[in-house]
Amino acid sequence: MALPGSSQDQAWSLEPPAATAAASSSSGPQEREGAGSPAAPGTLPLEKVKRPMNAFMVWSSAQRRQMAQQNPKMHNSEISKRLGAQWKLLDEDEKRPFVEEAKRLRARHLRDYPDYKYRPRRKAKSSGAGPSRCGQGRGNLASGGPLWGPGYATTQPSRGFGYRPPSYSTAYLPGSYGSSHCKLEAPSPCSLPQSDPRLQGELLPTYTHYLPPGSPTPYNPPLAGAPMPLTHL
């Protein structure tokens, strides 16, 4: 004997599957329609559109695949070189079918992408390893710094082109009874300043022979015709 409550539960349990089945039946044709519809040719962005193939590309598409299978270790650049040499050996009658196919592909490409323009990509120029020494010299000149190296020390702070006195160093000589002697060292030619093009028009002051501190001033005779001072009287 069937209970009335059980029939109600059975009727309630059958209602949700009927609703889901109806929803799946309504969405099924839409999914099948969207999956089977082909993409329109004009939906691809122009940046990703490739150029139409020319006659050589149409001919070499099959030849390249065949040559790559015969020579798997051959580089792609070598394959292109050989295909180009073979294409030049063909006569006009052998090239005609590929030329016609290239014209057909170009017409279809123009119809599908009327706003297409070929924009070749430029290769980025590789920067140098570092700035040259000439560039550093020009930068120092513009900033007012010296053109020579940092090891050069000038004695004239105003110009930096004054005479550099020779450096004296005391060295112990064996057999000299413990006496120290002064050893004169000539300045190296690398330490001399270079010519500055900004100061070519200026006259640099003349310098006499260098005298160490404490040495007497050399006697300079007076000019002819000038009266001598009577300081000895």
From Swiss-Prot:
Residue ranges, compositional bias (Polar residues): 1-11
Function: Transcription factor that binds to DNA at the 5'-AACAATG-3' consensus sequence. Acts as a transcriptional activator and repressor. Binds synergistically with POU5F1 (OCT3/4) to gene promoters. Binds to the FOXK1 promoter and recruits FHL3, resulting in transcriptional activation of FOXK1 which leads to myoblast proliferation. Acts as an inhibitor of myoblast differentiation via transcriptional repression which leads to down-regulation of the muscle-specific genes MYOD and MYOG. Involved in trophoblast giant cell differentiation via enhancement of HAND1 transcriptional activity.
CDD domains xrefs: HMG-box_SoxA_SoxB_SoxG (cd22028)
Region (Disordered): 1-48, 113-153, 208-233
GO CC annotation: chromatin; cytoplasm; nucleus; transcription regulator complex
Keywords attached to this entry: Activator, DNA-binding, Nucleus, Phosphoprotein, Repressor, Transcription, Transcription regulation
Stretch list, region Interaction with FHL3: 138-183
Segments of skewed composition (Low complexity): 18-27
Record protein name field: Transcription factor SOX-15
GO BP terms, alphabetized: brain development; cell differentiation; chromatin organization; male gonad development; myoblast development; negative regulation of striated muscle tissue development; negative regulation of transcription by RNA polymerase II; neuron differentiation
Pfam family for this entry, one: HMG_box
Keyword Transcription regulation: yes
Region Required to promote HAND1 transcriptional activator activity, residue ranges: 1-47
TM spans (from-to): none
Record keyword Repressor present: yes
